[in-house]
Amino acid sequence: MRVLFVASEAHPFIKSGGLGDVAGALPKELARKGVDVRVVIPKYREINNELKNKLRFNKWFNVDVGWRNQYCGILEYEYDGVIYYFVDNEYYFSRGGMYGHYDDAERFAFFDRAVLDMIKQLDWKPNVIHCNDWQTGMIPVLLKLEYMRKDMFYWDIKSVFSIHNIAFQGVFDPVILPELFGYDYEQYTNTNLKFDDGVGFMKGAINYSDMITTVSYSYAEEIKTPEFGERLDWLLREKSYMLRGILNGIDYDEFNPKNDSLINKNYDVNNINDKYENKRNLQSELGLSVNENIPMIAMVTRLTSQKGLDLLVHISERLLQNDIQLVIVGTGDKHYEDHFKWLDYKYGNKVSANIRFDNNLAHKAYAASDMFLMPSLFEPCGLGQLIALRYGSIPIVRETGGLKDTIRAYNEYTGEGNGFSFYNYNADELLHIIEYALKIYYDKNKWSNLVKNAMNSNNSWSKSADEYLNMYKELSYR
């Protein structure tokens, strides 16, 4: 089985969110299961310098972008048993930031066509091309409309498209069809690519892929509804026979409190008390009151409305009347950043607002905290709660998307469950469930059992990789 995994980012080379983690961990797990899996991403300027210097030039060729004929270099590097390819074009990718440029349509039109040209140039034919999010959305379109019709090399290649966040769809002016792809407006007028008055990369992928996946079972159902479907719900209902939810996992090599070099004291489920040394160290480092008995609640997140920050802002003053500590790590919208800075100023020994993305501090927060807050408005899968479980930090989540699938509400009478959850997007419900969690925290026997349940949860990539592999095999035999 040969699989080409196409993404706009991949850890450890470069990442801005969960997609980068998936593109770094899932291919590695597939390779362990005997799949010849290769990953391709753009060669951005910001790629990890240490790794960038190890990239080896393979070959170059020209790629048609409408009437343009652009240079494309292919570099490669093998990491953890997986070959990574890097599509090089200084004009498109050697600039600050991965996304948000005025010509993103052109940049990723080039990338998508370069990927299809690359496999022919390298004479490596995958059974399946696995595309991820809108930046790769035109690959299934190009494959079906053009490459399969022109060249027998491509005729039996299948395509999978994974939706990591349906809110970002890549919609651009219809003029990109002739300008960037050399097509007429038929695909716009027949509505296969039409979204409002634009052309949607993601809509095209949904229409032309052989299989559609998303990153949790619940999110696969949610995006078929008007509330979560971002006006593609009707199309996903039509395509529901080819839509599957497969839960993300986390990389158990990277996130392992037993040998994590970024935390102060390593521990595992058999010596949970060592976790408290991490707590005391972080309290001291952040200027909080050093007391292992005070419950510490952490958030490591983008500070955006999607993450439920409106709820936390609304209850923060009432919440902080409790004897707790709140640790925030992340950046995002300015009004949230300012609010948490103000809380830090007002409640200096109870609140630590770290308005930056700091991977070292993130690992320390997972290891030190007692509870991990994710009251998301929507959450396709979520990785934070999975990492928190691994480190014995009990997730407090809203029942949506992957949070609903991975967190089982604690039952104090049976001792079952691995976290706490609430259903409605309501600030008072959030406050109530946090206060309930605090009540359980002070019952040390119950809390100790809950932490063991959390740390014994299995969220590795192995099970998910099996589901992907079965899907690839099913597609390749069609």
UniProtKB/Swiss-Prot annotation:
Enzyme Commission numbers on file: 2.4.1.21
Superkingdom of origin: Bacteria
Catalyzed reactions: [(1->4)-alpha-D-glucosyl](n) + ADP-alpha-D-glucose = [(1->4)-alpha-D-glucosyl](n+1) + ADP + H(+)
Keywords: Glycogen biosynthesis, Glycosyltransferase, Transferase
InterPro entries membership: Glyco_trans_1, GS/SS, Starch_synth_cat_dom
GO BP term (any one): glycogen biosynthetic process
Gene Ontology molecular function terms on file: alpha-1,4-glucan glucosyltransferase (ADP-glucose donor) activity; alpha-1,4-glucan glucosyltransferase (UDP-glucose donor) activity
Pathway(s) annotated for this protein in UniProt: Glycan biosynthesis; glycogen biosynthesis
EC class name: transferase
Transmembrane segments: none
SUPFAM superfamilies the UniProt entry points to: UDP-Glycosyltransferase/glycogen phosphorylase
Binding-site positions, ADP-alpha-D-glucose: K15
Family: Belongs to the glycosyltransferase 1 family. Bacterial/plant glycogen synthase subfamily.
Job of this protein: Synthesizes alpha-1,4-glucan chains using ADP-glucose.
Matching NCBIfam families: glgA, PRK00654.1-1
HAMAP family tied to this protein: Glycogen_synth
Entry protein name: Glycogen synthase
Taxonomic source organism: Clostridium botulinum (strain Eklund 17B / Type B)
Gene: glgA
